[in-house]
Every structure is written in structure tokens, then in C-alpha cells.
């Protein structure tokens, strides 16, 4: 009887075990927006091959172009403010129905011509300055995902480099002109229109650079 209980307990416990599944990284294949046109192959030259007079520049959906990212940005701003204000007011009743001659009134209020005398002043000085400089250099290959009616190319590229469980991810999106592509099939990032360039990290080092959730809550709630 005891053996049956032990076997039944083991069966129940095995049902509570959660199998660890391997995390699969997302595929880097971009969805092509425009399908490649179908050409009829000839007996000598294939439609998928480069023409006799064509160069190696990207021009079709699915072609690869190398983006040389050289982004530099800097900005600075300085402001100063100074304000001041002062005011003074005085009021009195030197003559009021002859009461100023009464000794009772004058003894209680001293001088009716100086019943009220007040002054106020305020001053504010403020200054601030900010400066920022950013530099990003990288080289990444992107894929042509669409060819616009004016022959401009929409590109998208992503590169993920993992070192010691730390991922460095570079992504580039935008629109380029075929004429800006060099003979080496490269293009500088300054010629990418509507450019979306990002460089981010994922891993324990990136997590340690962020404040904890409790500190974020306190920063939002702290009124001073």
C-alpha cells in the first residue's frame, strides 16, 4: 500500500513540473512590401542575374545595400531671467467731521493722517544652461523592402551582436535614392530620408544602468 502512495505522490509532483523552453530570438527577415517582378528566363541570361551593363548597386526588392552610419549632433542653450517689483501705499484721514480735534480720538489713534503705511518688494533671479553632444558610428547592411514609383528605395536593416549574454542591437530604417549609392554599393546615413537609427543594449549591464522601480515611483511622487 505504501508503494502505491509513493508512486501516486511522484506522479502528482511530476505534473507540477514546468518544462523550461528555450527562448528563440526573433527572425531578422523583414517582410518585403513589394513582391519581386516575374521575368521570363532566356536561354543565355537569367532574369535574376545582373545585366551585362548593370553595376552592383542595389535597385530591386531584396537587394542588399551597406549603410555607413556617421551621425553627429550637438546643441546648447542658455537663458537668464531677472525680475523686480516694489510697491508702497499710505493712507490717512487728517480731517473727519472735526474729530481730529477731539483729545479722545487723537489719544487713541495718535495721528489720523497716518492710519495706514505699507510697502512690499519682490525680486527674482534665474539662470539655466544645457548642452548635449552625440556621436554614433556604425556599419550595417540593409535590405531593400520596397521600390517607390519615383525609383526611391525603402530600406530596413538590423544587426544584433551578443557578447557574454549582452546584446547590442543596431537598426536602420529609411528611404534612399539610387543615385546616392556609391560604386561600392554603400551609402552614408546623411543621405537616408526619414531615417530611424537606433543603438540599444539588452542584458544585465543595461539593466544595472536603470534605476529600480521603487526609485522611479518616488521620483514621480516626490514633490520637491
UniProtKB/Swiss-Prot annotation:
Keyword Metal-binding: no
Record's keyword terms, sorted: Bacterial flagellum, Cell outer membrane, Lipoprotein, Membrane, Palmitate, Signal
GO biological process: bacterial-type flagellum-dependent cell motility
GO molecular function terms listed in the Swiss-Prot or TrEMBL record: cytoskeletal motor activity
Lipid-conjugated positions (N-palmitoyl cysteine): 16
Lipidation (S-diacylglycerol cysteine): 16
Main location: membrane
InterPro entries: Flag_Lring
GO cellular component, as recorded: bacterial-type flagellum basal body, distal rod, L ring; cell outer membrane
Location of the protein in the cell: Cell outer membrane; Bacterial flagellum basal body
Signal peptide range: 1-15
Pfam families attached to this UniProt entry: FlgH
Membrane topology: Lipid-anchor
The protein's assembly and partners: The basal body constitutes a major portion of the flagellar organelle and consists of four rings (L,P,S, and M) mounted on a central rod.
Homology family: Belongs to the FlgH family.
Role, per record: Assembles around the rod to form the L-ring and probably protects the motor/basal body from shearing forces during rotation.
HAMAP family for the chain: FlgH
Official protein name in the record: Flagellar L-ring protein
Native species: Trichlorobacter lovleyi (strain ATCC BAA-1151 / DSM 17278 / SZ)
UniProt lineage: Bacteria, Pseudomonadati, Thermodesulfobacteriota, Desulfuromonadia, Geobacterales
